[in-house]
Amino acid sequence: MANTNTKKKSAALSGQEIPTLNIKAENIIFISDIHFGWASSSEEWQENQERYFNEWFIPYIQKTLAERPETVVVSLGDVYHDRKSIDIDVNELCIDTFERIANIIPCYIINGNHDLSKKTNKGNSSLRSLTNIKNLTVIKEPTLMKFKSGTKVLASIAAIPYLGDCNDENKWLVEFSGKAEYALMHTDISKMKFDNGMTIVGAVDAEKFSGRVISGHIHKRQETPKVVYVGSPYQMSRGDIGNQKGIYLLTLEDGELIFTPNNFSPVFQKLDIKQFMNMTDVERREKLNGNYTDIVIDEADVPNYKMADIYELMNTSGAKRAQLEVKKSKIDVSDDEDGRSTDEKTVEELIDQAIESLEGVDEQTIAELKALSSQYLSAAREAEDQK
């Protein structure tokens, strides 16, 4: 099993010492954005998360250790969801879960923004409740992790927790560039996508780092040659529809990043009413059982169906939650320049269109307005999904 010892290394950036962790391990399992306490700490979501860890993630760890003994787990932030208060049952679930994990494998956690009381890493952290767990290390400041096999250094990895300032995070990327092959972060990264699909601008610049960046924070899993957003381990809202969740394993000897899909946890999905009604009982239960499903019906088609029949089929499907979504009929709409009518565009596209039509505004301001709009809509969606 991997083990760790700590020493200090001087840092040109801070004038202080950069913590350095020497870790005997050849592989890293990445998980991120667990968000214990999601959906207002509902019992339903506590059950979802408990089952995920007990029935999928921990068995995955055990299987991996059987094949690759020198492996550790790294969580890339947002272990908890609520910055202000944590439900007692949620806290117990989190502690119990990480005690189980750390009992079988070394575990490292970097601060995410939801783990902090303030919007920087200067405040208190909810991760303090995990610091007394044996075999678990919480990383609260930029740290160099050196992974070794015997005396051979397989990889040097920079761990940069959420700092609350992309300028500071950029400086640390520059500091670690050339000294580490990977940077582990929890942040917004320019040119990647927010969960709502909007492009991130004015954030951390991954090009300042010579290696590859692996980050938490954005829930939608994304990969480019330069950046990997690990994403949340399971779908958490409608914004995750179509985004395959799972776990990454990095093999340090050859730099291979292996993705294992999570086909265990509930998913969010939308079904057209005709598709839903034409399914057999067996097909319907297979599709909806344990999942969150919106059944979409056009407003004009409502009179063609008996609502009682639809609700009866939904209620007997075994779904975690199934609800009817009435889609407004299209009325007197005009086509835009791209050939799509206004009601065919997303809210984000319509706002972008309005921003781009502003007169006397430079490109940088337009980009910043789009970024602010995107962040607001992401927060609004998250709040809506937790109702």
What does each model-identified segment do?
Residues 30-32, 72-78, 106-113, 137-142, ...:
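Active-site neighborhood of phospho(di)ester-bond hydrolases with catalytic His/Asp-centered motifs
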Residues 35-39, 81-84, 110-124, 145, ...:
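Active-site environment of divalent metal-dependent phosphoester hydrolases
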Residues 15, 22, 26-27, 41-144:
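Core catalytic region of metal-dependent phosphoesterases/phosphodiesterases
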Residues 135-136, 181-183, 225-231, 311-322:
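Active-site regions of enzymes building and remodeling cell-envelope glycoconjugates
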Residues 195-260:
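Conserved beta-sheet core of the metallophosphoesterase superfamily
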Residues 99-103, 174-177, 203-209, 242, ...:
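Short, conserved loop/helix-junction motifs that constitute active-site signature segments
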Residues 115-204, 233:
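Conserved catalytic scaffold of divalent metal-dependent phosphoesterases
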Residues 2-24, 66-67, 252-387:
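Accessory, non-catalytic peripheral segments of nucleic-acid enzymes
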